[in-house]
């Protein structure tokens, strides 16, 4: 633990004050651990938010001082007829074009910076979305092909590690500041955890676009297929966070641990080398983990200070990427005006 923590550049722990906006809860994947996906026949499902609904949420986020608009949606949601119908009603042929305009609206009509996470995208779609996103992201989750034959991923073609690695690689080729990470406790082995972290390190070494690596622990909840699955132990998380920090010790890549999934143990992970809490919202729930509420910002500050660190707010895009090598003029001007 001490060895991992000593590689810190400073005593700062960062977070991004965001709003979490699910544009649709429809998804082609059906992961055994998922709390996000809903089916079209579910009366509570978000089929597709309107621009007016999104803008109202963004304006509320502005009042709370948020700087990041996190747009999430199920992978290839526009393959579902109900989403297709909504898109056609709104005048669109596909969800990427719609998301592009949502992000453009965010830049033009609010003070927030868009960060899109919608699963795998083609090279062409990533290239388009790069123009209106300060950063993007997608969890690698695991490089284990074996998990494709287990309850975790056997109904989720988009979780094929080859496809996900290609998406993250294409983001690097396009110089998109990118957030990724791994999910532990879904049936992977320690060797597969190591392989997943090494794959992310390889992509960072090749393209330099990985700005943070999330170490996320599976948490069970009622109603999911893996409801009775055993969660990873505290020691599993400690080992993985330390391994991640040591693997990226010679870089400025942040190691992130979600505080809402580790309320009673979060401070320990700071001592293991984690240096980022990720996005924390004062205005919206964590739709991916709805049974795990965010800590308040006051609570987050107390947790951080009590562990001997200083909490500071950051943008969704890390400072090192705020230049014309990574961002276009529109985004750079937007960020300059926010400073």
Swiss-Prot record:
Cofactor: [4Fe-4S] cluster
Keywords from the UniProt entry: 4Fe-4S, Iron, Iron-sulfur, Lyase, Metal-binding, S-adenosyl-L-methionine
Annotated Radical SAM core domain residues: 13-258
GO molecular function, one term: transferase activity, transferring alkyl or aryl (other than methyl) groups
UniProt subunit comment: Consists of two subunits, CofG and CofH.
Pathway given in the UniProt record: Cofactor biosynthesis; coenzyme F0 biosynthesis
Pfam families: Radical_SAM (PF04055)
Binding residues for [4Fe-4S] cluster: 27, 31, 34
Organism field: Methanobrevibacter smithii (strain ATCC 35061 / DSM 861 / OCM 144 / PS)
Taxonomic lineage: Archaea, Methanobacteriati, Methanobacteriota, Methanomada group, Methanobacteria
Catalytic reaction annotation: 5-amino-5-(4-hydroxybenzyl)-6-(D-ribitylimino)-5,6-dihydrouracil + S-adenosyl-L-methionine = 7,8-didemethyl-8-hydroxy-5-deazariboflavin + 5'-deoxyadenosine + L-methionine + NH4(+) + H(+)
CDD domains: Radical_SAM
Biological function: Catalyzes the radical-mediated synthesis of 7,8-didemethyl-8-hydroxy-5-deazariboflavin from 5-amino-5-(4-hydroxybenzyl)-6-(D-ribitylimino)-5,6-dihydrouracil.
Name recorded for this polypeptide: 7,8-didemethyl-8-hydroxy-5-deazariboflavin synthase
EC number: 4.3.1.32
SMART domains for this protein: Elp3 (SM00729)
Cofactor annotation remark: Binds 1 [4Fe-4S] cluster. The cluster is coordinated with 3 cysteines and an exchangeable S-adenosyl-L-methionine.
InterPro entries reported for this sequence: Aldolase_TIM, CofG_family, Elp3/MiaA/NifB-like_rSAM, F420, rSAM
PANTHER family assigned: 7,8-DIDEMETHYL-8-HYDROXY-5-DEAZARIBOFLAVIN SYNTHASE (PTHR43076:SF15), FO SYNTHASE (COFH) (PTHR43076)
Catalytic EC class: lyase
Protein origin, superkingdom: Archaea
Stored SUPFAM superfamilies: Radical SAM enzymes
Homology family: Belongs to the radical SAM superfamily. CofG family.
């Amino acid at each position: 633990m001490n060895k991992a923590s000593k590689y810190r550049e400073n005593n700062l722990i960062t977070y991004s004050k965001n709003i979490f906006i699910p544009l649709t809860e429809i998804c082609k994947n059906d992961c055994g651990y998922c709390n996000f996906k809903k089916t079209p026949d579910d009366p509570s499902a978000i089929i597709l938010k309107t621009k007016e609904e999104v803008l109202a949420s963004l304006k509320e986020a502005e009042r709370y001082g948020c700087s990041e608009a996190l747009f999430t949606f199920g992978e290839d949601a526009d393959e579902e007829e109900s989403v297709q119908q909504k898109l056609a009603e709104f005048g669109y042929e596909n969800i990427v074009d719609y998301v592009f305009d949502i992000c453009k609206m965010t830049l033009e009509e609010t003070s927030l910076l868009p960060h899109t996470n919608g699963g795998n995208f083609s090279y062409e779609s990533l290239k388009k979305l790069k123009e209106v996103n300060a950063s993007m992201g997608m969890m690698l989750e695991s490089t284990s092909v074996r998990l494709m034959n287990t309850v975790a991923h056997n109904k989720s073609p988009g979780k094929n590690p080859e496809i996900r690695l290609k998406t993250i690689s294409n983001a690097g080729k396009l110089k998109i500041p990118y957030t990724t990470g791994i999910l532990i406790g879904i049936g992977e082995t320690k060797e597969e955890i190591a392989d997943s972290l090494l794959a992310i390190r390889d992509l960072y070494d090749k393209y330099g676009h990985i700005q943070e690596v999330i170490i996320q622990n599976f948490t069970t909840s009622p109603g999911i297929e893996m409801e009775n699955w055993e969660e990873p132990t505290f020691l599993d998380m400690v080992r993985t966070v330390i391994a991640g920090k040591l693997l990226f010790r010679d870089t400025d890549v942040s190691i992130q641990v979600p505080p809402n999934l580790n309320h009673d143990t979060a401070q320990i992970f700071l001592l293991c080398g984690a240096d980022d809490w990720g996005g924390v919202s004062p205005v919206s729930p964590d739709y991916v983990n709805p049974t795990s509420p965010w800590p308040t910002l006051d609570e987050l500050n107390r947790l951080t200070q009590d562990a001997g660190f200083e909490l500071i707010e950051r943008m969704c895009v890390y400072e090192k990427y705020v230049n014309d090598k990574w961002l276009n003029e529109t985004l750079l001007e937007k960020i300059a005006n926010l400073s």
